[in-house]
Amino acid sequence: MHDAVTRPTPPADATAWPRRITQAVKIGSVTVGGGHPVVVQSMTNTDTADIAGSVKQVADLWRAGSEMVRLTVNNAESAAAIPRIVDKLRMMGIEVPLIGDFHYNGHQLLAAEPACAEALAKYRINPGNVGFGKKKDLQFGQLIEFAIKYGKPVRIGANWGSLDQSLAAQLMDENSQRDTPWDAGRVLREALIRSAVDSAERAVELGLPRERIILSAKVSGVQELIAVYRDMASRCDFALHLGLTEAGIGSKGIVASAAALSVLLQEGIGDTIRISLTPEPGQSRTQEVVVAQELLQTTGQRAFTPMVTACPGCGRTTSEFFQELAGVVQNHVRAKMPEWKITNPGAENMTLAVMGCVVNGPGESRHANIGISLPGTGEAPSAPVFIDGEKSVTLRGENIAYEFIELIDQYVERTYVRRAG
């Protein structure tokens, strides 16, 4: 096995641990690991054979900020659709790397559809169901041969819902011989890690370069995920994909993902993430991308859009106007960010504050690049605006929202040097 990587010493100041040093994996135009920024990825839930529907959803996820998108490739129709999906996306000016998600029959599909093998930017392989019994090594080897032939990276992703049962049984037998047997949870974690890491080392033996391998070992429990990735990170130098295998629906899924991934990211573990949310009825699939971006931004890993701080409101606030203004401001900067990213680089680092009364309003506003403190109960009907810590102007009347948005736009043009063109 490759030399293990030692966990870094925690910093004494208010920063994350140094990023774990890993292999850098090139996936289309995106680089994962090797000190590069943590990459946001997502997955479609369309029938991949539905080319129009899949193209639309990939485009939506890409526009929301997904830097890689995974699609199910589970039958001949979906495999045949992949090249056409890539072509249609390119016609739209979208060059997002597409990842093929293979289970059970990937070796057959790639053999039958060479154009699919060529069009995909990465293959996801599950060592728990790539093959069973004597066929396992053969079929795993065939998938790796395709990756080598077409120059593609792979993610070897173990999952506790489809764990290699022969390996699990072997480790259970070994555990029964210990003087002090491990509990079942520890044996399960060991099986997940061994499944991923041993499969990766086997891929290297077959000729796949280390810099074309990403690993994951997913579970649904927060503490289990943290334990698995801490252990796996100490055993190898492969880039790691983070995510709960099924985070859940609504706020539960968001909280669970944030609880697990923020700990690992704080410790420098993780090179690409996916938030596996179950969309609520009528909710956009793009929410998982927004949550992933907000998680990385709030933990200081990356900046995607200006962050808006707003107070929750209390008995001191006279209306919901400050809450409405906070929403208007957040929507405005998110809508402007694609333009600012090109013309005003650095605007994504801007901080904004929309506060509802005099208690914390002026102080919080001074901490932001631009902040506004709206009047609370019994306060004068005026709203001082602070820019870079200094009081700039006081807004009054019916046009406070419009005037504050205008101040934000002016600040961006003045502070973040506009690129020509």
Swiss-Prot record:
Residues bound to [4Fe-4S] cluster are: C311, C314, C357, E364
In the record's cofactor note, how is the cofactor described as bound? Binds 1 [4Fe-4S] cluster.
InterPro entries per the record? Answer: Dihydropteroate_synth-like_sf (IPR011005), IspG_bac (IPR016425), IspG_bac-typ (IPR004588), NO2/SO3_Rdtase_4Fe4S_sf (IPR045854)
Pfam families linked: GcpE
Q: Which cofactor does it need?
A: [4Fe-4S] cluster
User: What keywords sit in the KW lines?
Assistant: 4Fe-4S, Iron, Iron-sulfur, Isoprene biosynthesis, Metal-binding, Oxidoreductase
Q: What is one Gene Ontology biological process annotated in the Swiss-Prot or TrEMBL record?
A: isopentenyl diphosphate biosynthetic process, methylerythritol 4-phosphate pathway
Please list the reactions this protein catalyses: (2E)-4-hydroxy-3-methylbut-2-enyl diphosphate + oxidized [flavodoxin] + H2O + 2 H(+) = 2-C-methyl-D-erythritol 2,4-cyclic diphosphate + reduced [flavodoxin]
Please give the Gene Ontology molecular function terms for this protein.
Answer: 4 iron, 4 sulfur cluster binding; 4-hydroxy-3-methylbut-2-en-1-yl diphosphate synthase activity (ferredoxin); 4-hydroxy-3-methylbut-2-enyl-diphosphate synthase activity (flavodoxin); iron ion binding
Family membership noted in the UniProt record? Belongs to the IspG family.
Xref: NCBIfam families? ispG_gcpE, PRK00366.1
- What is the protein named? 4-hydroxy-3-methylbut-2-en-1-yl diphosphate synthase (flavodoxin)
Q: Which organism is it from?
A: Xanthomonas euvesicatoria pv. vesicatoria (strain 85-10) (Xanthomonas campestris pv. vesicatoria)
Lineage, uppermost ranks: Bacteria, Pseudomonadati, Pseudomonadota, Gammaproteobacteria, Lysobacterales
Recorded name of the encoding gene: ispG
